Amino acid sequence: MDASTLFKKVKVKRVLGSLEQQIDDITTDSRTAREGSIFVASVGYTVDSHKFCQSVADQGCKLVVVNKEQSLPANVTQVVVPDTLRVASILAHTLYDYPSHQLVTFGVTGTNGKTSIATMIHLIQRKLQKNSAYLGTNGFQINETKTKGANTTPETVSLTKKIKEAVDAGAESMTLEVSSHGLVLGRLRGVEFDVAIFSNLTQDHLDFHGTMEAYGHAKSLLFSQLGEDLSKEKYVVLNNDDSFSEYLRTVTPYEVFSYGIDEEAQFMAKNIQESLQGVSFDFVTPFGTYSVKSPYVGKFNISNIMAAMIAVWSKGTSLETIIKAVENLEPVEGRLEVLDPSLPIDLIIDYAHTADGMNKLIDAVQPFVKQKLIFLVGMAGERDLTKTPEMGRVACRADYVIFTPDNPANDDPKMLTAELAKGATHQNYIEFDDRAEGIKHAIDIAEPGDTVVLASKGREPYQIMPGHIKVPHRDDLIGLEAAYKKFGGGPVGQ
């Protein structure tokens, strides 16, 4: 596409050079800029990428978007704008032909449950023989092909490229985990959502948002916007068991479907039966009551299942068809995942990293604990420490607790575990500044019949260490290796 055409929708301060050049790529990553690319520089929290403009010029890039004029060769066109990332969004959606308009787009937000609900929607679509894509905490997936991702919600250009990739692969729908960071930072500008789903709102990310009010407002942006095409049939799915849904209902202009277990809603779960093999319940709907069975464990997952089913139903699939698909869904990786049922202990990993998430996790497993419940939890570095003692208090619902760091980054691991220990309500706990050693200790003290829960990371494949270096780490593999060494069995898979 000709650059002059691309910039027709952009208000610029000035253009230094010619826009008469062909463009086939937009990037905010200086390492990938080349001839035919537009490089969009920006001022981030830690890096000002304007300093890489000369490097991209050396790589053959002939057009840069900047917020002030740079010292560059005369053959490099500079487009000066006030807000480079907003312009990046406009350019990306224009160049890639507004890809989110070309499929059904589901957006899932909330403190806990985003990954589970988003993954369930994707898996239901696959059971229905529909081409589907997913983007979130567990990476990027088109049908069964997976690649890793860096952020829950990538920056705007990368996100648009992923949606375009899904469209080109024939995806009929795409499900996005929508983070509060992504909403506030404008990473979702230009994305057209068909269905927005809310799980819950509990304390998290106050290091970024400052207050719960600001955090809640960030989440509400998804429901008040849902894109720019107000003529489309769009829907909102809200959890009535969370009081924040009342506010979200007031900010969205679209039709709302509500679900709940404890509070009255249009769609409800009754007569709930739970085990470590899954759940069953009566799904009470405006159209009748249906029996639902699922391999997912825990009462909180019933809420997630309902949210996913309603989202898919809202776009035209019958509930009977969806319920049949739900019975055979694969587990969501790292979410209340039971590792190797042949072991004499119940070894479980989960992503719960807030007090609310941990409470729900313990609620789910405690009825099935045969002997002791051993619970390991970590606190992330450079995060909101005000939530940490409450996490320690909740962890002490278990018989024995292990406090570790989780992605300590530049914080002192001993400080992080000490913050968790401030909330301890009994003395049956121990602190480890090395998470792997904490996991090994959990297995070492476990006896047949015990339940060991490794919380906070799920299947996250790294630890963020000083200097923000990512060091390979897998809770599941470390736990299984220790369990096989003690109890026999194996080998550990990848």
Curated annotation (Swiss-Prot):
It catalyses: UDP-N-acetyl-alpha-D-muramoyl-L-alanyl-D-glutamate + L-lysine + ATP = UDP-N-acetyl-alpha-D-muramoyl-L-alanyl-gamma-D-glutamyl-L-lysine + ADP + phosphate + H(+). ATP binds at G110, T111, N112, G113, K114, T115, S116. A motif (L-lysine recognition motif) lies at residues 406-409. Keywords: ATP-binding, Cell cycle, Cell division, Cell shape, Cell wall biogenesis/degradation, Cytoplasm, Ligase, Nucleotide-binding, Peptidoglycan synthesis. GO terms for cellular component: cytoplasm. It comes from the Bacteria. It is found in: Cytoplasm. It is an enzyme of class 6 (ligase). This is UDP-N-acetylmuramoyl-L-alanyl-D-glutamate--L-lysine ligase. InterPro entries: Mur-like_cat_sf (IPR036565), Mur_ligase_C (IPR004101), Mur_ligase_C_dom_sf (IPR036615), Mur_ligase_cen (IPR013221), MurE/MurF_N (IPR035911), UDP-N-AcMur-Glu-dNH2Pim_ligase (IPR005761). Gene3D superfamilies: Mur ligase, C-terminal domain (3.90.190.20), Mur-like, catalytic domain (3.40.1190.10), MurE/MurF, N-terminal domain (3.40.1390.10). Its EC number is 6.3.2.7.
